[in-house]
Curated annotation (Swiss-Prot):
Domain of life of the organism encoding this protein: Viruses
Subunit annotation: Homodimer.
Role according to the record: This protein may be involved in virus assembly.
InterPro entries hit by this protein: D-63_sf, Helix_hairpin_bin_sf, SSV1_D-63
Transmembrane intervals: none
The name this protein goes by in its record: Protein D-63
């Protein structure tokens, strides 16, 4: 797989994962306001952060 293709795929994955994280953060914020904190959503958000970190690390290695 070429460097350009790998970078493109990594950017697409990052875009998708960042959007998912933003959605989760929005949901968590609403849950907090309504008093319905959901620890599962916090766990999912934390997992998304770890995925994003790994993808950024891969991007550094490829660049």
């Amino acid at each position: 797989m070429s460097k350009e293709v790998l970078e493109k795929e990594l950017f697409e994955m990052l875009d998708e994962d960042v959007r998912e994280l933003l959605s989760l953060i929005h949901e968590i914020k609403i849950d907090r306001i309504t008093g319905n904190m959901d620890k599962q959503k916090l766990g999912k958000a934390y997992f998304q952060v770890q995925k994003i970190e790994a993808e950024l690390y891969q991007l550094i290695k490829v660049s």
